[in-house]
A protein has these predicted regions:
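Residues at the start of alpha-helices and the adjacent loop-to-helix junctions
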Residues: 13, 18-20, 47, 54
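Low-complexity, acidic/polar, glycine-enriched regions of mature
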Residues: 28-202
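N-terminal signal peptide c-region/cleavage motif recognized by signal peptidases
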Residues: 21-25
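Bacterial N-terminal signal peptides that target proteins for export
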Residues: 2-16
C-alpha cells in the first residue's frame, strides 16, 4: 500500500469522523421551537355510520423547549371554542354538550420528554410523551411525530386518537345516528427554531 493511498484513506476517514461528530453535536443541542398559529393546523375526524365529519380547531399559542438529554417543556394551547365542522348546529352541540367549552375553553398538551434525536437538518421520527388536557382533565399520552427542520424553521406532523367518551365526555349519538366514541386528531405544526449550546448561552 503506497504512502499516497494511506494518506488519502486517513483524510477520508478524518472527514467522515468530522461529519459524524458535527451531526451528533447538532442533534445534541438544546432547541426552542415556536409554533406559528398562521402556519399550524389542528384537524379532527369523527366517524359515524353514514360518513366522516371533518373539522378544525385554532391554535392559540405554542412554545416547546427540547434539551439535549431528551427533556421537554412548554405547551401547545388550542382554542376549544373554535371547533368548526362546517355545520353551525353541530358545532354548537359539540361546544355545549361534548367539550363544554364555555367551562373548559382550552385544550392543551404539555410535553415532558422526547424519545429519539431530532436532526439539525432534515427529517426525524420521534415519540413525544406528555400530558394532554381536555375537558378539564389531564391524560397521559405518547404520540409519534414526524419532524423536519432546517436552519431556522421546523414542521411536525402528529396523529393520535382521543377516546373522548372514555375520558368523561358525552357521546353525541342519537337514536338514529351513532357516532364513534373516539376522534382522530391531526396536528401539522410549523414555526421557527432557535438552537443554542452551552457556549452560546454564557
Amino acid at each position: 500500500m503506497s504512502k499516497t493511498y494511506r494518506y488519502f484513506c486517513r483524510q477520508f476517514l478524518n472527514a467522515g469522523l468530522l461529519f459524524v461528530g458535527s451531526t451528533l453535536l447538532a442533534s445534541a443541542q438544546d432547541a426552542d421551537y415556536q409554533l406559528d398559529p398562521a402556519q399550524t393546523s389542528v384537524k379532527f375526524t369523527l366517524d359515524d355510520v353514514l360518513h366522516s365529519v371533518h373539522g378544525t380547531f385554532k391554535l392559540k399559542q405554542g412554545h416547546l423547549e427540547v434539551e439535549s438529554d431528551g427533556k421537554m417543556s412548554g405547551q401547545i394551547v388550542v382554542d376549544a371554542t373554535s371547533g368548526d365542522s362546517g355545520s353551525g348546529m353541530r358545532d354548537r352541540k359539540m361546544n355545549k354538550e361534548v367539550l363544554e367549552s364555555a367551562r373548559y375553553p382550552e385544550i392543551s398538551f404539555r410535553p415532558d420528554r422526547i424519545e429519539g434525536p431530532v436532526a439539525g437538518s432534515g427529517k426525524s421520527s420521534v415519540m413525544i410523551h406528555g400530558m394532554f388536557n381536555i375537558h378539564g382533565a389531564d391524560q397521559e399520552i405518547t404520540v409519534p411525530a414526524q419532524v423536519e427542520t432546517d436552519a431556522d424553521h421546523w414542521t411536525a406532523a402528529v396523529h393520535f386518537t382521543v377516546p373522548y367518551q372514555k375520558w368523561g365526555m358525552k357521546n353525541p349519538s342519537t337514536l338514529f345516528l351513532r357516532v364513534s366514541d373516539t376522534v382522530e386528531i391531526d396536528l401539522i405544526a410549523a414555526g421557527t427554531v432557535a438552537r443554542h449550546t452551552a457556549q452560546s448561552t454564557q
